Amino acid sequence: MIEVEKIINEFQPISLNEMDEVKLMSRNDTKFAFRSSKLPQLLNQMYPFYRVLSIDGLKIHDYKSLYFDTKERKFYLDHHNRRVNRNKIRFREYVGSKLTFLEIKLKNNKGRTIKKRTKVKKINEHLSEENKSYIKKVIGHDIEVEAKQWINFSRVTFVHIKDKERLTMDLNLTYHDKNDKGDLKKIIIAEVKQEKMSRKSDFMRIAKQLSILPIRISKYCISTLKLNPVVKSNRFKEKVLFLNKLISN
């Protein structure tokens, strides 16, 4: 990790205000998962093409998230069953910038991710009436949800020096609920965020050279499955086997 931090700190910085130009609240996402041992080589090759978000001189930022779902885990099952127009609801604390939001993500029938959010004072395990009203406004109807699990990680956010592209890398991921806990600390989850899908991305080109290939993966769904092995999971089995192989190799 010391080597990784040293390489990341060599990247040219970009501020939050500058990054607003590539906020991409409606976007195409492409995810990747790979062993953390590949990170130094990957970062060195990315260096000429990307800047890194810097807040108060820090380029690695902690995120805390509390995910909500229905009692029957509708959001998890919608994802598992490949239903379009599906949602995720969470509180997320951006620790470094001291900001917390209630966030709602929609994956629409065109494969685009649309994120709506409203600022809140802190993460709450119980939704306030104001929270519920906001969720109804965004989703379009009332829905009863409850806190399910925490997912915490450190994130590095890259912004391409020329293209309208952002890239996040999540490190040291941990998850827990009231009964169990686990982690994916040996794995990096990267996500390319683009206005329009383009395989010409410098990250995608470099990743392919290092045999890092795209994978559809959800931190919420994988942690749900790990914490609740009895949930429906047949369509996620290949992904779980892939992640287990990354961890064990």
Where in this protein do the model-derived segments appear?
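Phosphate-end processing signature that detects enzymes handling 5′-triphosphorylated RNA
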Residues: 1-249
